[in-house]
Regions:
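Structured binding/interaction patches within domain cores
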Residues: 105-106
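Aromatic-residue-lined binding/catalytic grooves and analogous aromatic/hydrophobic interfacial grooves
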Residues: 109, 113, 123
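Conserved small/polar residues in nucleotide/adenosyl-binding loops
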Residues: 142-148
Length: 151
């Protein structure tokens, strides 16, 4: 791809077709800063579908649905100190901020994106493995009536 081959990429057309956030994400994630990169519209679409729609979109959809269904749309308060250091999400969460900060400082935007995607994928895997919706037990009629009877 290049001017001499008369097949340059028009970023304005790409943005008009897919939106600036999608274009920005792809180039930050897939093409290392300061290095020539290779662009394919097919690859562009595949990356967006796999990482943003499937991985991130799926995580947001599942998490928000569970928050709405089980916690009245609120984020429950959790004491982070009560979560074991060996918990897979905590292990990543502890190091993620520093890792992304260092990646940004060294212009390693591709690495920063990949670090965040590891967290997203680990969250999805955790949800798949633990099936939290099956662990939730609504308050039974007995639990509601016992305090009343005791009074």
């Amino acid at each position: 791809m290049g001017k001499s081959q008369n097949n340059t990429l028009n970023p304005f057309e790409l943005i008009q077709k897919y939106g600036s956030d999608a274009v920005r994400y792809y180039f930050i994630k897939e093409i290392e800063f300061g290095v020539d990169g290779d662009f394919s519209e097919t690859r562009f679409i595949n990356v967006l579908n796999a990482e943003l729609a499937n991985d991130l979109g799926n995580l947001l959809n599942r998490t928000l649905k569970m928050a709405h269904k089980y916690f009245n749309g609120q984020i429950p308060k959790i004491n982070g100190e009560e979560v074991e250091v060996t918990h897979p999400l905590k292990k990543i969460g502890i190091s993620l901020g520093e890792e992304v900060t260092q990646a940004y400082a060294s212009l390693g935007f591709t690495h920063a994106c990949e670090a965040v995607l590891i967290l997203v994928r680990t969250c999805n895997k955790y949800i798949d493995e633990t099936a939290p919706w099956s662990l939730y037990k609504p308050v039974s009629y007995t639990h509601l009536t016992l305090p009343t009877i005791r009074s």
